Regions:
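Helicase C-terminal subdomain and adjacent C-terminal extension
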Residues: 4-5, 9-33, 468-539
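Conserved helicase motor core of P-loop NTPases
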Residues: 26-33, 39, 50-70, 76-79, ...
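Inter-Walker segment of RecA-like/P-loop motor cores
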Residues: 107-176, 456
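Walker B catalytic acidic pair
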Residues: 183-184, 210
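Conserved ATPase-coupling elements of RecA-like P-loop NTPase cores
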Residues: 184-196, 215-222, 481
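Conserved helicase C-terminal RecA-like lobe
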Residues: 353-500
C-alpha cells in the first residue's frame, strides 16, 4: 500500500492549496486495537493526535501545530514510538551533547534550537522507559546533530588567526537519519534550516512541531512559516493541560482570541498605582516587591522566572538580574573582566550559559590573564560595580592579578592571541545536566553566551517552563508589546502569572499582532501571500 492510499484510508486529504492543508475531519479505523492506535496502552489519542501518528508511520513530512495545552508533547512521544517501529535496524552515529563522544542509535532525531528546549523534550519523551533506553541521545539540539565544531583559519583582512563554528555534517558528510522532528520549530530561522537541509539525505521525513502563536525568530521569518504553506498540517484542537482549571491556560487562549484576560489568584496584574513612572523608579519598586515576595516565599528563584521584552534598559533582563542578585546572594562579589565587558558575579549565582541554566560553583584568578586589574572581590562590592561600604584594604585579596608578568618579546604570535582572549577570572559552573565547565576566555563570558538567569527576555524563555512567571510590561516596551510576546510569556508558566505593568499595556499587547490572522487558516494564507516569491524548500 502506498502512503497516499494509507492516508486516504484514514480520511486524510493530501492538499493542493494552502487553505486545504488543515485537518478538518479524521476517520479512525475502528478495527485498529488500542495498542495499534496509540503505541501505548495507557494513552488514548484523540482524532487529531491519531492523524499525526499515522502520517509519521507513513513516512510523510508534515506540520504538527497546537496551542498551549493541546497535547503536542504526548503526541510527539507517540510519534517517536511509531517512527521507531519502522526503523528496520537503520542507525546513525550521534554525538552526545556536552561530552562529544559518539553513540550508535536508531536513525531518527528530535531536535530543538536551544539546549533548554532539547532538555525539556528529552525529559518528556524519555518518561517512557522504553524510549529512555532507545532514544535518549537522539533528542538534542540542531547544532549538536550537525556536529558544529570550531574551525581555525587565517583572516586576511584582520591579518590574524580567527575561529568560527561550522557544521561537520553537510552535503559531503550527510546525516544518515531517516526522520527528523523539529520541536519549537517557530524558533528556527532560515540560515540554520539551510544548514540542516544541506545535511539531510534526499527523502528524509521532516516533522515540524510548534505553536504558530509564539514569537518568531529575532531576525526574519521562521522555517515553520514556509513549512505551513508546503506541507500537510495537523492542528491539535482539544485542550488537555490542566483542563482549563487554571487561569494561566484560560487567559492564554483569551489572549489568542483577542479577549480581555481574567484576574484571580493564579493570574495577577500589579499596576503599582495610577501614575506611570519611568523605568528607573519602576525598577526600584519592582526590586522592593521581589525582595518582599522572596522573604515571604511567594517568589522562588529556583522555580520562578522574571521576563522582560528587552535585555537592555533599567527594566531589561540585565538590570533586573543585577537587582535580584543583589538581595539574593550576599557572598563576595567578583568583578570579572571579559574583553570590554565587566560582570559582577558571586559563587552560587544562577546563570545561563549558551542557553542552558546552571550555577556558579567557584571563581578564581586566571593565571593567563594580563589585562587591567579588576577590583578586589568583596561582599561590599555591589552588582553594579560600586563599593557600598569601606573595606579594610589590607584584608582584600587581589587574587594575584597584579603580579602577572609576561615576557612579551619571547612569546609567539599564537601565544599572544591566546593571552589577549583571556578573562580576568576562571568561572567554574555546573549546568542542570550535571556538566561541569570552566569558563576562562572572554568569548565564553560574552553577553551572547553568559548571563545571570533570574530574569530572561521572552525570546530566550521559549521552550522553557517555570512554576511562576513574573512579566514586566512598561510603556517603554510598547514597540514589542504584541500578542505573540504576551502569549509566549504567559505559556511559560505552569501555575501562576504575575504581570507588573499597567492594564492598558496588557490590552495593547492583546490587540496587536505581528502575524496577521485569527485562525490557523488565515495565518497560512498570510504566509502564502508573503512567501510566494521565495525559493525555500521544506521537503
Amino acid at each position: 500500500m502506498t502512503w497516499q492510499e494509507l492516508l486516504a484510508s484514514r480520511g486524510i486529504a493530501i492538499p493542493q492549496k494552502p487553505e486545504d492543508t488543515i485537518n478538518k475531519r479524521v476517520v479512525v479505523n475502528p478495527e485498529l486495537s488500542q495498542k495499534e492506535k496509540t503505541f501505548s496502552l495507557n494513552i488514548e489519542l484523540d482524532e487529531d493526535q491519531n492523524t499525526a501518528v499515522q502520517l509519521a508511520l507513513a513516512g510523510k513530512s508534515f506540520c504538527l501545530i497546537g496551542k498551549a495545552g493541546t497535547g503536542k508533547t504526548t503526541t510527539e512521544r507517540e510519534i517517536v514510538k511509531a517512527i521507531l517501529s519502522r526503523m528496520n535496524g537503520r542507525t546513525h552515529i550521534f554525538r552526545i551533547q556536552g561530552t562529544g563522544e559518539k553513540v550508535e542509535s536508531p536513525a531518527a532525531a528530535v531536535v530543538s534550537y536551544t539546549r533548554v528546549a532539547a532538555g525539556n523534550s528529552r525529559n518528556a519523551i524519555c518518561k517512557d522507559e522504553e524510549l529512555r533506553n532507545a532514544f535518549f541521545h537522539n533528542v538534542t539540539t540542531i547544532h549538536n546533530l550537525l556536529e558544529y565544531a570550531p574551525v581555525f583559519f587565517y583572516d586576511d583582512e584582520k591579518e590574524k588567526e580567527s575561529m568560527r563554528f561550522i557544521p561537520q555534517r553537510n552535503a559531503l558528510n550527510p546525516l544518515n537519519v531517516q526522520t527528523i522532528a523539529i520541536e519549537e520549530s517557530s524558533m528556527v530561522d532560515l540560515n540554520l534550516w539551510d544548514r540542516l537541509y544541506d545535511a539531510m539525505l534526499s527523502g528524509t521525513q521532516v516533522i515540524f512541531i510548534g505553536d504558530i502563536n509564539q514569537l518568531p525568530p529575532v531576525f526574519g521569518p521562521s522555517i515553520l512559516n514556509y513549512a505551513l504553506v508546503q506541507l500537510p498540517i495537523v492542528e491539535l484542537r482539544t485542550v488537555y493541560r490542566q483542563k482549563f482549571d487554571s487561569l494561566v491556560l484560560t487567559n492564554a487562549h483569551n489572549i489568542l482570541e483577542g479577549k480581555e484576560v481574567e484576574e484571580g489568584p493564579d493570574f495577577k496584574i500589579i499596576e503599582g498605582g495610577t501614575k506611570q513612572h519611568g523605568q528607573t523608579v519602576t525598577m526600584l519598586q519592582l526590586a522592593g516587591s521581589l525582595k518582599r515576595w522572596y522573604e515571604s516565599g511567594e517568589y522562588k528563584p529556583d522555580e520562578d522566572i522574571i521576563l522582560s521584552p528587552f535585555n537592555k534598559g533599567d527594566l531589561g533582563s540585565d538590570s533586573i538580574n543585577s537587582h535580584v542578585a543583589q538581595f539574593l546572594n550576599d557572598g563576595d562579589v567578583y568583578e570579572v573582566i571579559a574583553g570590554i565587558r565587566k560582570l559582577y558575579v558571586a559563587v552560587g549565582d544562577k546563570i545561563m550559559f549558551q542557553k542552558q541554566v546552571g550555577r556558579i560553583i567557584n571563581i578564581k584568578h586566571n593565571p593567563m590573564y594580563a589585562g587591567k586589574i579588576p577590583k578586589p572581590h568583596s561582599k561590599h562590592l555591589s552588582r553594579f560595580g560600586v563599593m557600598l561600604e569601606e573595606d579594610d584594604l589590607d584584608s582584600l585579596e587581589d587574587d594575584g592579578l597584579a603580579h602577572v608578568e609576561y615576557n612579551l618579546e619571547a612569546m609567539s604570535k599564537e601565544d599572544m592571541e591566546e593571552l589577549t582572549h583571556q578573562a580576568s577570572h576562571v568561572v567554574e559552573i555546573e549546568l542542570e545536566t550535571g556538566e561541569l565547565l570552566a569558563l576562562r576566555k572572554a568569548g565564553e563570558l560574552s553577553a551572547q553566551n553568559f548571563s545571570l538567569a533570574y530574569a530572561l527576555t521572552v525570546h530566550k524563555a521559549q521552550g522553557c517552563e517555570w512554576r511562576k512567571v513574573i512579566l514586566v510590561l512598561h510603556k517603554d516596551h510598547s514597540i514589542l508589546a504584541f500578542n505573540e510576546l504576551l502569549y509566549t510569556a504567559v505559556t511559560r508558566a505552569a501555575k501562576q502569572v504575575v504581570i507588573v505593568g499597567k492594564k492598558f499595556m496588557v490590552a495593547k499587547a492583546i490587540a496587536t499582532r505581528r502575524i496577521k490572522g485569527d485562525s490557523l487558516k488565515e495565518k497560512v494564507e498570510y504566509f502564502n501571500a508573503n512567501l510566494a516569491q521565495s525559493h525555500i524548500s521544506c521537503v
